[in-house]
Amino acid sequence: MLSGIEAAAGEYEDSELRCRVAVEELSPGGQPRRRQALRTAELSLGRNERRELMLRLQAPGPAGRPRCFPLRAARLFTRFAEAGRSTLRLPAHDTPGAGAVQLLLSDCPPDRLRRFLRTLRLKLAAAPGPGPASARAQLLGPRPRDFVTISPVQPEERRLRAATRVPDTTLVKRPVEPQAGAEPSTEAPRWPLPVKRLSLPSTKPQLSEEQAAVLRAVLKGQSIFFTGSAGTGKSYLLKRILGSLPPTGTVATASTGVAACHIGGTTLHAFAGIGSGQAPLAQCVALAQRPGVRQGWLNCQRLVIDEISMVEADLFDKLEAVARAVRQQNKPFGGIQLIICGDFLQLPPVTKGSQPPRFCFQSKSWKRCVPVTLELTKVWRQADQTFISLLQAVRLGRCSDEVTRQLQATASHKVGRDGIVATRLCTHQDDVALTNERRLQELPGKVHRFEAMDSNPELASTLDAQCPVSQLLQLKLGAQVMLVKNLSVSRGLVNGARGVVVGFEAEGRGLPQVRFLCGVTEVIHADRWTVQATGGQLLSRQQLPLQLAWAMSIHKSQGMTLDCVEISLGRVFASGQAYVALSRARSLQGLRVLDFDPMAVRCDPRVLHFYATLRRGRSLSLESPDDDEAASDQENMDPIL
């Protein structure tokens, strides 16, 4: 376990924030008349001698004198809080001619910014403090004491906030305003997005000790690969990591478009700007030297790569060489900190021809670029220890008679209810499209069409590749659907939740009403996805967060948790494919396996050797879930061709 708990200690601080700050002094008319930009500053919440809530701004260095601002009647604009930006407007003082002061916060770690804003809101609501003192009271009063850092938020303050429910005028996401010079539109928007309030966690989500160790290593600037079986919280941890890092200089990528969309990033190929990566190295370097692409490489300080198992070794080596060439640094990966996540025992790289794939850990540059490796071992997705043990055996390519018996017994499971049928996971995307189209056509009634609104329709193909929603969604009464975005975790409306369309609004947009397996019935409104195209261009798609769910591909299910699953393993063609499919299920009771063949359970021996080496060298745990049974387990390994 890594030491250096202090590296991550700041993650849990709610009253302090380090970021870029621009201080604007406004005229009485609201126009900026003086501006000071601070590349790095520390904001602290505290109180003065009269218990007034104050904000202290401290610039680095001995010359940076702290400034304190009273927070009475402060207004906070949080439309871009998820991107690490916010604006705090402080009202004018009683001094004649004085104007308001505006603090523009940027490059904040998004999670820390959210907690900072939540603390501010709770403190303002619980104890707004006395009004401003008169000049006479200030002269006759005690000498001002030093700034006192605010106390942590207390349970009583949370209860008071919930009980009073004062109108929240401080934390508001403002609607998008039309650009200057643009002609006003007379057409009503097809997909009006409801104004959402800033999402702030009611409590501090706790990381497990092994997850905290990964975060500490990242915050210390170490390049790291963290791995773990399906359901160990890799995706959740990756989002926590991204929320703890400054947005500037942090690039989130993944090997596939869907995985990239889940973490709010772009594909590794789109960031690199070298096309498919099949060209010779000199040509790849030339492609990366193009102005827009080159600047992306130069600005990158931390590169996140998710689903690393699907990145081929030759591509990784080329990217490493391109990084050194473009950045003109001979350090590993050009001095970029790598934060790599994935499980090599899941889906392998896609290759053409009969040649077996070469995994990233087989690349020449892997060891020098990734000095730290940590494994997550606690499974969060499944609660049944029997099912967890079964999945761990399948992950290692072990299919004993008991594992075979348990999986074959699921063929009789009735995994759907209330008109909701199981989603069938298919090995080939063509089967998915045909199944969903056929089942939709078989339903009686009218087809309801919902077209997406794309920020750039000419780049719809890029959005199709990276968004979990399609440009056109067709639904009927009784259509099987899946939620592809978290709407309300507490109510069970999460990514992967299964449901059935039970109606459509009679008025307005005719939005679908969906009854979910968790028992909730909800009218589904449009949501927005933002992806990054080649060259850093941001694209957005506005669409219902639904997709047809009679069938979906195993590749697109990677990283998801499904309520009820039906799997056919008869056409499994890659190592790890059976394991990925089986591990999507939340429970053994929600799983039905058809035509099970023990030979479908296999893994690549090179990956087993890689993990065994890590276990010996870094104390990684890769023991069998059942040591007594391990000796008799049959290991189905793909031959190395």
UniProtKB/Swiss-Prot annotation:
Localization (cell): Nucleus
Entry-linked SUPFAM superfamilies: P-loop containing nucleoside triphosphate hydrolases
Entry keyword DNA repair: yes
HAMAP family named in the record: PIF1
Modified residues (Phosphoserine): 27, 151
Catalytic activity, reaction form: Couples ATP hydrolysis with the unwinding of duplex DNA at the replication fork by translocating in the 5'-3' direction. This creates two antiparallel DNA single strands (ssDNA). The leading ssDNA polymer is the template for DNA polymerase III holoenzyme which synthesizes a continuous strand; ATP + H2O = ADP + phosphate + H(+)
InterPro entries: DNA_helicase_pif1-like_DEAD, P-loop_NTPase, Pif1-like_2B_dom, PIF1_helicase, PIF1_RRM3_pfh1
GO process terms (BP): DNA recombination; DNA repair; mitochondrial genome maintenance; negative regulation of telomere maintenance via telomerase; protein-DNA-RNA complex disassembly; telomere maintenance via telomerase
Notes concerning its domains: The PIF1 N-terminal (PINT) domain enhances the interaction with ssDNA through intrinsic binding activity, it also harbors DNA strand-annealing activity.
GO cellular component terms, semicolon-separated: chromosome, telomeric region; mitochondrial nucleoid; mitochondrion; nucleoplasm; nucleus
GO MF annotation terms: 5'-3' DNA helicase activity; 5'-3' DNA/RNA helicase activity; ATP binding; ATP hydrolysis activity; G-quadruplex DNA binding; magnesium ion binding; single-stranded DNA helicase activity; telomerase inhibitor activity
Gene3D superfamilies associated with the record: P-loop containing nucleotide triphosphate hydrolases
Pfam families, per the entry: PH_LRR1 (PF25344), PIF1 (PF05970), Pif1_2B_dom (PF21530)
Residues covered by region (Disordered): 173-192, 622-641
Subunit organization: Monomer. Interacts with telomerase.
Organism superkingdom: Eukaryota
Protein name listed in UniProt: ATP-dependent DNA helicase PIF1
Main location: nucleus
Group of enzyme by EC: isomerase
Hydrolyzes ATP in the presence of both magnesium and single-stranded DNA, as annotated region: 167-641
Stimuli inducing this protein: Tightly cell cycle regulated and expressed in late S/G2 phase.
Origin species: Homo sapiens (Human)
Family note: Belongs to the helicase family. PIF1 subfamily.
PINT: annotated segments: 1-180
Tissue: Weak ubiquitous expression.
Amino acids binding ATP: 228-235
UniProt-reported outcome of changing residue 234 to A: Loss of ATPase activity. Lower activity for single-stranded DNA
